[in-house]
UniProtKB/Swiss-Prot annotation:
Its EC number is 7.1.1.2. It is found in: Mitochondrion inner membrane. The keyword Electron transport applies. It comes from the Eukaryota. It catalyses: a ubiquinone + NADH + 5 H(+)(in) = a ubiquinol + NAD(+) + 4 H(+)(out). Core subunit of the mitochondrial membrane respiratory chain NADH dehydrogenase (Complex I) that is believed to belong to the minimal assembly required for catalysis. Complex I functions in the transfer of electrons from NADH to the respiratory chain. The immediate electron acceptor for the enzyme is believed to be ubiquinone. This is NADH-ubiquinone oxidoreductase chain 2.
Length: 296
């Protein structure tokens, strides 16, 4: 219970930090609170996470204390957040995590680094480009749903970086991504699904449709909510044509892959009929279909 309280308090400190040193202290508190939660599931994953976060923290602290190394601040934050090309640690530990811990890692654990990048208004085209393509291509031919979500997280980081020039746009994108992801995670956790093979046999039609809608929304397929926040990002930011093309193409890769998953799962006959599983499924479908009306 104490570790969860410390974790929650660290998020409050991150949001209320007004200096680099304050942000560093809150991120350290956050990491030290999150590691005990990871240890309960895997000591190996917690060790990997500790080492990566420690290296990034040392770089970050050295950068803010010595102006000669200030150019390293965004690199330290990108390592912490798992953006490409520093994403391999995130992929490595994601494949054996529970849905609860993985969802925290892909959402709330990114608050500190995202705030730091927003303070810098970091919109480097190279990192946006490489995160978009690795995130889009990485999920292809993966059968582990946790790995698919991890690569999806890398892809969405590219869109978050696109919106770094406006804190409001970044916040809207982040909150929307968080909501879509958590709907998907709730459904997957209830059924105990961890692989694509399980999607073909262990759920009712409504359940499979709802998880498919969430995946397609994460990929950015119209008319789901995920499409509208990506469209908003392109409309509200001044981007080079090449970068826009890269973002659109990477989203197309994701849509193609997720659409094939959705079709293969929905075409299989349903055997399980559980109202407990159908209620959140119906809610998530309504969320993804009707909320986009506010963007019109």
């Amino acid at each position: 219970m104490i570790k969860w309280l410390c974790l929650f308090f660290s998020y409050i400190l991150m949001v209320s930090s007004h200096s680099w040193l304050g942000l560093w202290l809150s991120m350290e508190m956050n990491s030290l609170s999150f590691i005990p939660i990871m240890i309960e599931e895997s000591k190996e994953n917690s060790l990997k996470y500790f080492l990566i976060q420690s290296v990034a923290s040392v770089i970050f602290l050295a950068s803010i204390l010595n102006q000669s190394f200030s150019f390293l601040i965004p690199f330290a934050l990108l390592i912490k957040i798992g953006a490409a090309p520093f994403h391999m640690w995130l992929v490595s530990i994601s494949k054996s995590m529970s849905w609860k811990v993985l969802s925290l890692l892909m959402t709330f654990q990114k608050i500190g680094p995202l705030l730091g990048l927003a303070m810098l208004q970091f919109t480097n085209s190279f990192f946006i480009f490489i995160s978009a393509f690795i995130g889009g291509l990485g999920g292809i031919n993966q059968s582990n749903l946790r790995l698919i979500m991890a690569f999806s997280s890398v892809s969405h980081l590219s869109w978050l970086m696109v919106n770094m020039s406006s804190f409001f746009l970044m916040l809207v994108y982040y909150v929307t991504y968080l909501a879509i992801l958590y709907f998907a995670v709730i459904l997957l956790q209830q059924s105990g699904m961890y692989s694509l093979a399980q999607m073909n046999s262990n759920a009712s039609l409504i359940y499979k449709a709802s998880i498919s809608f969430n995946l397609l929304s994460l990929a950015g397929l119209p008319p789901f909510l995920g499409f509208f926040i990506k469209w908003m990002s392109l409309e509200m930011n001044i981007l080079s044509p090449l970068l826009v093309l890269a973002l659109v193409v990477s989203s197309c890769f994701s849509v193609y892959f997720y659409f094939s998953i959705a079709m293969s799962s929905l075409l299989f006959p349903s055997e399980v009929k559980s109202k407990k599983m159908e209620i959140p499924g119906i809610l998530s479908m309504g969320f993804n279909i009707f909320l986009p009306l506010f963007f019109l």
